[in-house]
Amino acid sequence: MTGPGELAGSRPVDAHLENGAGIDVVLVTGLSGAGRGTAAKVLEDLGWYVADNLPPQLITRMVDLGMDAGSRITQLAVVMDVRSRGFTGDLDSVRTELATRNIAPRVVFMEASDDMLVRRYEQNRRSHPLQGDQTLAEGIAAERRMLAPVRATADLIIDTSTLSVRALRETIERAFGGGANATISVTVESFGFKYGLPMDADMVMDVRFLPNPHWVDELRPRTGQDPAVRDYVLGQPGAAEFLDAYHRLLSLVVDGYRREGKRYMTVAIGCTGGKHRSVAIAEALMQRLQAQHGEAQLSVRVLHRDLGRE
């Protein structure tokens, strides 16, 4: 049994492959219950395009789509169902086909000890895919034998027996990018409280403490994107101080998200109708975040959920 994240082949996995095709391909395989799904989620958080349980014969077609002009797919991770008959031969065929495209895919094999796999299946009250009328232990043993040739040719073997989810994330980040320098995607979303709270918000801030431009006749029909409304909102007492303080708070939260391996954050800014104050503040906050953090560290976008709803 290997240690967590042991390199199985001679090819380094912690460096981006200089594939002539311009697309990096990772094939995630391994024992059922060893964490393939978790590994796929981490890769997705790192910006990889993830295809789950894609049949081997469709992998090259997916790669061809990624190589098409205009495609934004530069990193493709495929989670493969390795239990199908003839899988080892299929995997070899995929590697051969990709080699003709000047692509050398990396194979990640997820495994765990028999005791740990038994414990996980018992905790989830699920049967093993190969168990049939056998015992759970026999099903695990059968799959381990079936996948031995795949394991022997893997580029990276990750034993999750003693790994927490966080430790598994760190292992994958070290191999495939991310970690302390990973990009975090932040959505700054304006909304109106009268339409309800955003369900996907990680943080919610109420800016109804600022005077409402709705009560200024010449500003009422305009929105927070209008320079006159923006200047009115940002020029109010406390507005600049609020932006300074909330920006500092968000910077602390972003640093914490990065340490915890989280890659997505939604910050919701609310006012009464989501038309004036929240829009202006959300735009200003987005600009501050973009100015402080480079695009390589923080990807920021603004979303005005209720703009135009009146």
UniProtKB/Swiss-Prot annotation:
**Which keywords fit this entry according to its UniProt record?**
ATP-binding, GTP-binding, Nucleotide-binding
Q: Which InterPro entries match?
A: P-loop_NTPase, RapZ-like, RapZ-like_N, RapZ_C
Disulfide cross-links:
none
Q: To which protein family does this belong?
A: Belongs to the RapZ-like family.
What HAMAP family does the database record attribute to this sequence? RapZ_like
UniProt xrefs under NCBIfam families:
PRK05416.1
The protein's name: Nucleotide-binding protein MAP_1147
What is the species of this protein?
Mycolicibacterium paratuberculosis (strain ATCC BAA-968 / K-10) (Mycobacterium paratuberculosis)
Q: Lineage of the source organism? A: Bacteria, Bacillati, Actinomycetota, Actinomycetes, Mycobacteriales
